[in-house]
Amino acid sequence: MFTPLITTISLILGPTLHPEIVAAQDQLKSPSEIEKLSYDDAIARVNDILAEENSTNDIRPECHSIMKDHGKKTDKAVVLIHGVSGCPAHFAELADKFYNEGYNVFIPRMPKHGLTDNNRHGEVTLAELASFAEQTTSILSGLGEEAGVAGSSGGSSVATWIAQYGKGTVKKLLLLEPFYATYDKFQNTLVKKVYGWNLLPDILINGNLSLRALGKYLLLVDSYKSDMYAPGVESISVILSEGDKGIDHNEAANVSKKMADSSGAEYQYVELPKSMGLEHGIINPGDPLVIPHKEKLYDMYYKAYTGEKVSALAESNTIEDTETEEEQPSQLSELSLVLEQ
């Protein structure tokens, strides 16, 4: 009974109190024409971003945007997009693998992320996410003849948008632990409709994860095309951990599979087994849970990005066609405790 009530309240108060969020939603659903850039113009845009970041002391040294290029437009290029509360350092080592294979690689820093005060990622606005997605797509268009995107968690949410609205820019799509929804539907509604619309003060869960930021990414997910069509996309690979308690696994599978079917793209969905000890966060090279598996994981991610069929590193579920399963135990346990108070 509470979910319809929350939705009704947000529909009344949200647009009234925050018309800027309505405008950002419109921008995401009907973006301006994505500007296709030459290599020189794309690098100039990146250099502007780097110069702006270098002009402030607010960004942690390891969290500046990263550009690894070969001095020319290459046959292949990739953009790597970090997750909510993360920063480009999470993709730095995987970027080396792509670069050594001849790719131009860009790892942009999400707005309000990677700051010395990491709690400020909760200040990110939906308009900033929209502008970030558009600018990143334009830069990608100039870096390589065949371009693609890989994202982690909320970065996969943005990568999915870029694939759909990038006017054919994206050919390859790698979605690591894509954040399309929290598992519990009530939690998902509350985070999106209340915190996404800034109707309550922000709360940090797990020590440094902003509910307002999570809500903005969920609002971005609402902007996806109803048919999920992603023009030009040739392959979509999804990888997550069975032990991930931060996202809805069914949504991760069903949303991505619908996009692949609608776009005529090759598709694979792989869950890493719980025996690996991985949770939500399967990319950060400094994560103690990732370190023991890092070399094999990164090799898997690279192969999956290229469209090569991969299997998990041990016995696991590898799913080609995933239907919605019966209800599972509630996830985001700390979020549950916060919301019940």
Annotate each PLM feature.
Residues 243-247:
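Acidic catalytic loop of the alpha/beta-hydrolase fold
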Residues 168-215:
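Hydrolase active-site cap/lid region
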Residues 115-143:
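Catalytic nucleophile-loop/oxyanion-hole region of alpha/beta-hydrolase
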Residues 150-155, 159:
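Gly/Ala-rich beta-loop-alpha elbow adjacent to hydrolase catalytic centers
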Residues 59-110:
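Short, surface-exposed "cap/lid" segments of acyl-processing enzymes
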Residues 94, 248-260:
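Short alpha-helix in the alpha/beta-hydrolase fold that links the catalytic acid
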Residues 282-332, 338:
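Catalytic active-site module of serine/aspartate enzymes centered on a nucleophile-bearing elbow/loop
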Residues 232, 238-241:
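Short beta-strand/loop motif that positions the catalytic acidic residue
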